């Protein structure tokens, strides 16, 4: 349910012309319990198993002649603790204003990147957060760079610390985006993220180019992100100079849906710590029941860390259009040195060197309004 407040005013200078403004309050509350079994056992209550918990405001004003002024202010919530997500930022998920016109849409603020969109539930069975064989498994390249969770590195537009969807290239601060009108199912997008450091316009910035095609059954997208932050004097492993190529697609036929994607990170620093990620999944819907499965692989290159394979099965029961119960069983098979990867940060003690694989069982409920 969306709570909508509408104001309609009469434009006296233009008879029979109306300007309509609407503001909506919306959100998602998603809570789950997890049982993790690796070198040790752990029970968790977490927020955002299927979708990141959030509360937001969005509005639109019809300016006439096909022009609209829009805004979105959306903050993440850790429902298990009552705190704010995304490093404590008030509107850490999205915060932007936009002008939609017959010639395309221009927007500015904190916005999703093409990498975030392609790794989300639009193209993945387990989205890019939370439980299951999530695309958040992919990352840890180039000395710790996280292309899907959000990087803790000194990236051009990241202001928060930590690696849980805080900064670029997942969400891009100080960014401008232009999206073309749709033509024969195609639309293109360009995003620029400014580092906002005087004298370092080309040293602190992010470019994001994408192309998307959509028809009744197929949704496909390709993109390239150039993220660069080489601010003077920072250690090499805390600097960023990477290119990220991503391709994803979702195809629906009857009650079945098949989706997957590919991500390749090119580390342009001398260390050359490249990485690749793959995912392939599908679901089958029967009435209120949804059965899903997905495989995700994370493959760091030029390192001994080793690859991760995640195999996940999931089930969802829709009580209504706004509330569902979900469960999943996932195996994270980790190789190489290090402590391995799961869909989020690995809890201390869950894995140790030589014993890095983890089994996860989750049960949760999601409600949207």
PLM segments and residue spans:
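Gram-negative bacterial Sec-dependent N-terminal signal peptides
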Residues: 1-19
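Outer-membrane beta-barrel "beta-signal"
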Residues: 353-369
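Structural signature of outer-membrane beta-barrel channels/translocons
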Residues: 58-62, 100-102, 179-184, 212-216, ...
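Detector for outer-membrane/organellar transmembrane beta-barrel domains
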Residues: 207-318, 328-331
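Transmembrane beta-barrel outer-membrane domains
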Residues: 46-52, 88-90, 167-171, 200-206, ...
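Extracellular loop and loop/strand-boundary signature of outer-membrane beta-barrel proteins
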Residues: 40-44, 83, 162-163, 195, ...
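Outer membrane beta-barrel
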Residues: 21-35, 43-195, 203-205, 212-216
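Transmembrane beta-strands of outer-membrane beta-barrel proteins
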Residues: 23-31, 65, 69-73, 106, ...
């Amino acid at each position: 349910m969306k709570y909508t407040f509408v104001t309609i005013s009469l434009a006296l200078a233009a008879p029979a012309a109306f300007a309509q403004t609407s503001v909506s309050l919306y959100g998602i509350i998603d809570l789950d319990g997890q049982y993790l079994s690796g070198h040790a056992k752990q029970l968790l209550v977490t927020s955002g198993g299927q979708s990141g918990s959030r509360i937001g405001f969005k509005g639109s004003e019809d300016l006439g002649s096909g022009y609209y002024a829009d805004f979105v202010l959306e903050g993440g919530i850790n429902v298990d603790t009552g705190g704010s997500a995304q490093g404590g930022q008030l509107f850490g998920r999205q915060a932007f204003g936009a002008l939609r016109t017959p010639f395309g849409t221009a927007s500015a603020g904190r916005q999703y990147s093409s990498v975030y969109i392609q790794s989300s539930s639009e193209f993945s069975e387990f989205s890019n957060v939370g439980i299951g064989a999530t695309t958040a498994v992919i990352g840890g390249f180039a000395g710790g760079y996280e292309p899907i969770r959000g990087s803790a590195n000194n990236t051009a537009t990241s202001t928060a610390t930590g690696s849980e969807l805080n900064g670029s290239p997942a969400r891009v601060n100080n960014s401008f985006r232009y999206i073309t009108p749709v033509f024969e199912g195609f639309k293109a997008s360009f995003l620029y993220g400014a580092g906002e450091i005087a004298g370092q316009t080309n040293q602190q910035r992010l470019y994001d180019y994408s192309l998307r095609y959509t028809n009744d059954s197929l949704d496909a997208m390709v993109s390239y992100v150039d993220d660069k932050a080489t601010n003077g004097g920072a250690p090499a492993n805390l600097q960023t100079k990477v290119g990220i190529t991503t391709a994803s697609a979702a195809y629906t036929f009857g009650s079945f849906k098949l989706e997957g994607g590919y991500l390749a990170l090119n580390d342009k620093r001398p260390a050359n710590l490249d990485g690749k990620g793959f995912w392939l999944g599908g679901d089958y819907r029967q009435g209120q029941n949804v059965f899903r499965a997905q495989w995700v692989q994370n493959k760091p290159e030029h390192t001994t860390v080793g690859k991760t394979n995640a195999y996940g099965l999931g089930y969802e029961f829709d009580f209504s259009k706004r509330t569902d119960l979900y469960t999943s069983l996932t195996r994270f098979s980790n190789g190489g040195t290090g402590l391995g990867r799961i869909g989020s940060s690995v809890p201390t003690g869950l894995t140790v060197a030589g014993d890095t694989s983890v089994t996860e069982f989750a049960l949760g409920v999601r409600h949207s309004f």
